[in-house]
Amino acid sequence: MRAPMTLKGVRRLRDELEHLKSVKRPEIINAIAEARAHGDLKENAEYHAAREQQSFIEGRIKQLEGELSHAEVIDVAKLNAGTKIVFGATVTLADLGTDEESRYQIVGDLEADIKQGLVAISSPVARALIGKQEGDTIVIEAPAGRREYEVVAVEYIS
């Protein structure tokens, strides 16, 4: 199954993959070679740590390659949804209880990072937003309780 992902998200994953392959993998190979040179491998903590790190890096490389091969890349800048909220939209919300504004972009599950304002398409927040427009009110059931928001702005920024 294809997983939707923004162009920016795909670039970030490709950059990480390239870094792992061209920088981290050679570093670990050198660390293993150095540790081997120290002799007995049974009690060589450096060797075992380097092998463990190699295993982690190789696993992450495989994971990234798999994610990228299943990504359906969506160029947010080319979307023409107007003020309607769809995948890729950057939405400004006003909390009707506190008047605080927050801004989120709806992205694929693999690129979500709430600290950066990136919410997964499958999240309760995104599900409540999809199909809404500027001026609409949404209700989100959060762990802290029920929150009501107004959609202040909808943008499509790449």
UniProtKB/Swiss-Prot annotation:
Keywords: Coiled coil, DNA-binding, Transcription, Transcription regulation. The keyword Transcription applies. Residues 45-72 form a coiled coil. It comes from the Bacteria. GO terms for molecular function: DNA binding; RNA polymerase binding. Necessary for efficient RNA polymerase transcription elongation past template-encoded arresting sites. The arresting sites in DNA have the property of trapping a certain fraction of elongating RNA polymerases that pass through, resulting in locked ternary complexes. Cleavage of the nascent transcript by cleavage factors such as GreA or GreB allows the resumption of elongation from the new 3'terminus. GreA releases sequences of 2 to 3 nucleotides. HAMAP family: GreA_GreB (MF_00105). This is Transcription elongation factor GreA. The gene is greA.
